């Protein structure tokens, strides 16, 4: 081959995106050092707490019932309002050997030394957050399509939620329910653990796992229950 031919060949070589490669590499390192070691993921919503309970007491009961991961998701609270609540839950989850993830507020997660952060569709890019928190924190990402689950992996997430699987008022803004077939396809194609989200009850949890879900993410079935400890236990039977 002539020198010109070799030069043209070199010019045609694909350009390596070093930042992208580093994000994927860091994601793989994070998965080895900080695995997703829970399959019931409780997401908070203090507006659904029944009479006679506080958000703290509901979560405490859920932890007694076997929940091993809490996502603090109170979208209408400011950072100053969220921080003391996160500090209380950090102490509580440590007492029960459970994980605490903070929705969106990376600053709060770092301040209370949470186990991770959970990012939604309007959050900062996952790869940006991964660079900020390093490999010690878990990053969960909300997804609503198979393409989004793959993007989450490429950008450094550790796991994803996928939904809504069933009809649920709390996720009505995300459109019609995806159904079990879409969940199964997302689980089949995703390199990450997938948590089924949206309308999940203890009965439906079995269907979601049969479709390939690594675990389930729950809000009202436990947070809104008059017996949250019993409700939490029902997901492990």
Regions found by a protein language model. Name each.
Residues 46-47, 166-168:
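A short, flexible beta-alpha/helix-coil linker loop
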Residues 213-221:
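Short, electropositive alpha-helical surface patch
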